[in-house]
């Protein structure tokens, strides 16, 4: 019985059980033999479900009340068995197609006086449950459950744990369940009370799965007020070409409108005018502070371990906070609770292995996933001792387990550990990495109230080592969080669903510690540690006002408290320190309190067209400080101080959505303002000049643009075209005469074309082409000499442009011979297929033949790069 426990007791039950199945549906034609002693009604029903094609639908409280049942029948019609089973019990049964509906007889109610019948509140019941994969037992996130009765249609989507709840009037309903990568399923029910209906969906694909962008094309997505959201999950559309055969989720989302790549060799990205640090990246609710490997060439996310990714560009739900621009919410696989299995891949620079299986079938499961590069193994082949003793690799390990504690409780434990190591023997080295751990407890109070409680740990640190003679030192930096979260989802009635919750985070930031060797010409220094509490409470309601109008509104209230121990400063606009105040351990330095209201609106013009609008305010209390134009593992996170204030953004978005089956068209426009934006003084050195506030300047920003997406989801040819037209500016006191200037991430045009074609059952071809306007950069305006040394001087911040960027990637996947429990494939790809020499950086020097002239030197990272990888699953 799909809404109850699977019968573990059947393994030891002292009963005999036999049946003769029939394809015919009438209960008279299905005959069973059944012998049970002192069993509960739930156990009897589950035994009948095991040996017949029928499923029972009933209120949980009705079933659990019936116990101590004994029954002994041999080769009797099911209809006769049902009559015998329920004779003398206060339960009625009704056959509805392949379902047997159980209910208590209706109680006689006294006549209603006072209000006429037309004004009385109609009786409502709740249909609730979970949606899971039939093959693995994992929850299905974002599945759509549509209940239809005559001309009335009501829908809902499962939450991030696969739970759903629908409030409906009594009656007969057709329930249609759909999800990406799953077969559509229909159930027929007769609703006469609160009913639990757990659903198992069959996967559409049995071979290897890839990541691709997918969105629902049904009416549910049109009716939802949520804007600027994209969901990625395992699906039937095959792979996008990748660099060196390594699948990269963060690179994939950068092919969507409004999400801009930070460039080659950089896993950072910009969303609607925000900086790379303004994106909240979560792995099972834990923040990942540096989502990159190998200096940004690859992301920290091993696709074998990832189940679902949701990206919010605007109108972020109130449970998310702490960043201005976007949320990337990554959920790990839960592990197969039915069978053991493994998958993995072997590429040119890395290999992966993923193992999963049940700890106790149907109740608990585990997942272990690992990945490592082996570029350092090739370095050992060199005859140069400096090279063959060098190290260059990264590794990561994902682990997860979940336990079903009961009908209403489930516990999840998950963790991630990743590390990068780059070193040149006897010269220098750097290593960095993330560690996260999450413990989550799901509890179902009742059919309408769902709870998730989480305890989360996150740590990021780096260490730089220099072994140069006379200048030996180590630099260590760290940011560490402990976070407690609680979220309640209350499905109040057919028109309202409410989310309320809180989170409390303790931040510890160790900006840097420099330790010298015995003979080094450098003093040991420890920058002051910073401590803070970041708390928030929130409440939102999604209201289905009419069949055409939906509204989500709410507020998040954030409080950021700066704690001692440490010194805090008064600083003049010139950067000079005017005074110093010392605070003891735990002493409150300052508290920033910020309300963050939000509202989103959807109006469905017809069955295929909708208009949406949203407004959201976000606050950011942690800031990334960097001296380089590209992301670096040595970039430093700093928290608010008495000088560094919370960044605040206000964003308004308007969108048009059209289902042009088999195409989908989305057009969104936005305008965003940002306060307390950070830039740097000319000649700033963020590593040695302390306090850091003396190196910073503050101001405001604005961004606006138009995003266009046309996507085809079905057929042999699938893909999308995205285009973004945008402008991003900053106005910082002390820069460019206090006038508006281009932010580094300002790009006028950004285009991506993605296509996948299933040539045959075995071959799949794919390609993507990207183009974007070059970044705004600062180039020298002149030069001068001092004692024979050449120095460049700069007059206008971000007054020039890098060359325009464009690139074509192509790929092909060959599905190899499949066996019953084993599948494999070969993936071939070419990155930058026509060898475009895109600029990574441009430096300047005197021309060798004419010192009066200055020449620009362009550095290119990638030209044409072919790759091959082998992937398997069993």
Residue ranges with predicted function:
Residues 45, 51-52, 89, 95-150, ...:
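Short, acidic, small-residue-rich periplasmic hinge/interaction motif at the N-terminus
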Residues 139, 150-163, 594:
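Short, acidic Ser/Thr/Gly-rich low-complexity loop/linker segments typical of extracellular
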């Amino acid at each position: 019985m799909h809404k109850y426990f699977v019968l573990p007791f059947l393994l030891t039950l002292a009963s005999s059980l036999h049946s003769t199945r029939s394809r015919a549906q009438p209960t008279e034609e299905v005959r069973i033999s059944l012998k049970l002693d002192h069993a509960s009604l739930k156990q009897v029903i589950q035994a009948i479900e095991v040996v017949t094609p029928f499923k029972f639908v009933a209120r949980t409280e009705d079933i659990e009340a019936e116990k101590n049942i004994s029954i002994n029948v041999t080769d009797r019609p099911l209809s006769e068995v049902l009559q015998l089973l329920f004779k003398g019990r206060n339960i009625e049964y009704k056959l509805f197609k392949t379902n047997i509906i159980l209910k208590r007889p209706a109680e006689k109610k006294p006549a209603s006086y006072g209000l006429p019948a037309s004004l009385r509140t109609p009786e409502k019941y709740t249909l609730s449950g979970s949606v899971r994969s039939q093959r693995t037992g994992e929850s299905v996130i974002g599945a759509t459950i549509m209940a239809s009765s005559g001309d009335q249609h009501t829908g809902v989507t499962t939450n991030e744990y696969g739970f759903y709840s629908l409030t409906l009037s009594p009656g007969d309903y057709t329930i249609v369940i759909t999800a990406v990568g799953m077969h559509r399923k229909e159930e027929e029910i007769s609703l006469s009370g609160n009913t639990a209906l757990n659903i198992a969906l069959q996967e559409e694909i049995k071979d290897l799965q890839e990541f691709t962008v997918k969105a629902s094309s049904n009416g549910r997505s049109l009716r939802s007020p949520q804007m600027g959201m994209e969901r990625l999950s395992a699906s039937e559309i095959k792979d996008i070409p990748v660099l060196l055969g390594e699948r990269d989720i963060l690179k994939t989302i950068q092919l969507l409108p409004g999400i801009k790549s930070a460039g080659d060799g950089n896993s950072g990205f910009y969303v609607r005018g925000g900086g790379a640090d303004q994106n909240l990246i979560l792995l099972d609710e834990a923040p990942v502070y540096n989502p990159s490997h190998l200096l940004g060439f690859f992301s920290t996310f091993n696709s074998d371990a990832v189940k679902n990714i949701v990206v919010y560009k605007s109108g972020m739900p109130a449970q998310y906070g702490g960043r201005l621009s976007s949320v990337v919410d990554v959920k790990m696989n839960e592990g197969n609770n039915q069978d053991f299995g493994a998958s993995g891949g072997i590429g040119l620079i890395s290999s992966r292995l993923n193992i999963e299986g049940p700890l106790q079938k149907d109740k608990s499961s585990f997942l272990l996933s690992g990945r490592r590069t082996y570029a350092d193994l090739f370095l050992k082949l060199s005859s140069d001792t400096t090279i063959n003793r060098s190290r260059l690799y990264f590794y990561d390990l994902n682990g997860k387990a979940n336990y079903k504690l009961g009908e209403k409780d489930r516990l999840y434990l998950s963790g991630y550990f990743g590390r990068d190591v780059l070193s040149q023997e006897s010269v220098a080295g750097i290593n960095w990495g993330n560690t996260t751990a999450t413990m989550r407890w799901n509890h179902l109070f009742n059919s309408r109230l769902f709870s998730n409680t989480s305890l989360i740990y996150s740590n990021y640190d780096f260490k730089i080592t220099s072994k140069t003679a006379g200048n030996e030192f180590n630099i260590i930096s760290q940011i560490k969080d402990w976070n407690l979260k609680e979220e309640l989802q209350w499905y109040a009635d057919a028109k309202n669903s409410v989310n309320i919750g809180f989170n409390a985070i303790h931040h510890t930031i160790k900006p840097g510690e420099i330790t010298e060797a015995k003979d080094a010409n450098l003093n040991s220094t420890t920058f002051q540690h910073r401590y803070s509490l970041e708390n928030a409470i929130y409440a939102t309601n999604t209201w289905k006002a009419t069949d055409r109008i939906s509204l989500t509104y709410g507020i998040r209230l954030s409080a950021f408290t700066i704690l001692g121990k440490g010194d805090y400063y008064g600083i003049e606009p010139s950067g000079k320190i005017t005074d110093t105040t010392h605070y003891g351990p735990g002493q409150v330095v300052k508290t920033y309190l910020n309300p963050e209201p939000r509202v989103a609106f959807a109006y469905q013009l017809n069955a295929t067209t909708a208009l949406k609008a949203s407004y959201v305010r976000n606050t950011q209390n942690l800031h990334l400080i960097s001296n380089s134009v590209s992301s670096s593992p040595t970039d430093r996170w700093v928290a608010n101080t008495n000088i560094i204030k919370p960044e605040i953004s206000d964003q308004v978005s308007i969108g048009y959505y059209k289902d042009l089956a088999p195409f989908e068209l989305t057009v969104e426009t936005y305008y965003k303002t940002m306060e307390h934006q950070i830039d740097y003084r000319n000649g700033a050195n963020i590593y040695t000049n302390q306090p850091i506030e003396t190196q910073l300047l503050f101001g405001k920003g604005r961004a606006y643009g138009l995003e266009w997406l046309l996507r085809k989801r079905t057929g042999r040819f699938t893909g999308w075209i995205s285009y973004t037209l945008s402008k991003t500016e900053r106005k910082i006191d002390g820069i460019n005469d206090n006038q508006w200037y281009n932010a580094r991430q300002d790009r006028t045009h950004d285009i991506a074309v993605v296509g996948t074609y299933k040539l045959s059952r075995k071959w799949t071809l794919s390609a993507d082409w990207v183009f974007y306007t070059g970044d705004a950069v600062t180039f020298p305006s002149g030069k001068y000499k001092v004692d024979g040394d050449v120095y460049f001087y700069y007059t206008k911040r971000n007054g020039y442009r890098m060359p325009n960027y464009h690139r074509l990637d192509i790929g092909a996947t060959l599905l190899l011979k499949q066996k019953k429990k084993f599948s494999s494939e070969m993936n071939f790809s070419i990155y930058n297929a026509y060898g475009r020499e895109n600029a990574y950086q441009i430096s300047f020097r005197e021309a060798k033949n004419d010192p009066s002239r200055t020449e620009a030197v362009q550095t290119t990272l990638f030209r044409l790069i072919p790759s091959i990888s082998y992937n398997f699953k069993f």
